[in-house]
């Protein structure tokens, strides 16, 4: 198998086993690379990611992890592809760097869980951020957004191995979409991409994955007010969404969805049926 660290998908010869028969064919595998984030010359964490849109990832991660509070506090991002993986050098303001050093967090090896590698349990709980409340979204547009998902999952079509985070406008049009083997990294890429170059800010975000605690935490850090998930919602995610004033909707598929928190942002529904969710 020929592999290049900067490619997202690798073509490979495989053998399909089906009903007792073996057939040789060509398949596609999602590439997974080690990505090291270094802030002002100091190593911070190593993660596993799809090797594309890594500048967006670095910016989104830096924002969603509250290493900086504004994109202007990120002074530069440099990528270096090596045989071992990708080294991302992020330069932040001295004030932010000093605050980062004081966190004393050991995040090495974090791959898919927002709590992995945290030295003390109490350090896993960050102060709750309450998002703004001005966003509104007509629920009728959700189905339109879902119909666009397949066309915005190019790597998933080939490999079946990636998650996607997609930004929606008021009409349910997908205006930005990012894929990654890690669902939280896909969201970081979306957050970073929408923070760069004066990109249009989405009204809502649609995840192809479940909505876990970390996904809601990242959404709150980015002031994402409406979060749709095509899969399930976890208990801690629900609790955090309630406290953070985030409208959280899960199981968005086949013309149905389950509303968990803050339904007042959704238009086009029978308001009486939302009494317990508002």
From Swiss-Prot:
Sorted UniProt keywords: Cytoplasm, Molybdenum cofactor biosynthesis
Cell compartments where the protein resides: Cytoplasm
Pfam families tied to this protein: FdhD-NarQ
GO annotation (BP), single: Mo-molybdopterin cofactor biosynthetic process
Catalytic residues (UniProt): 113
Taxonomy, superkingdom: Bacteria
Annotated residues for binding of Mo-bis(molybdopterin guanine dinucleotide): 251-256
Gene Ontology cellular component list: cytoplasm
GO terms for MF: sulfur carrier activity; sulfurtransferase activity
Summary of the function given for this chain in its UniProt record: Required for formate dehydrogenase (FDH) activity. Acts as a sulfur carrier protein that transfers sulfur from IscS to the molybdenum cofactor prior to its insertion into FDH.
Protein name (database record): Sulfur carrier protein FdhD
Source species: Shewanella oneidensis (strain ATCC 700550 / JCM 31522 / CIP 106686 / LMG 19005 / NCIMB 14063 / MR-1)
Organism ancestry: Bacteria, Pseudomonadati, Pseudomonadota, Gammaproteobacteria, Alteromonadales
Name of encoding gene: fdhD
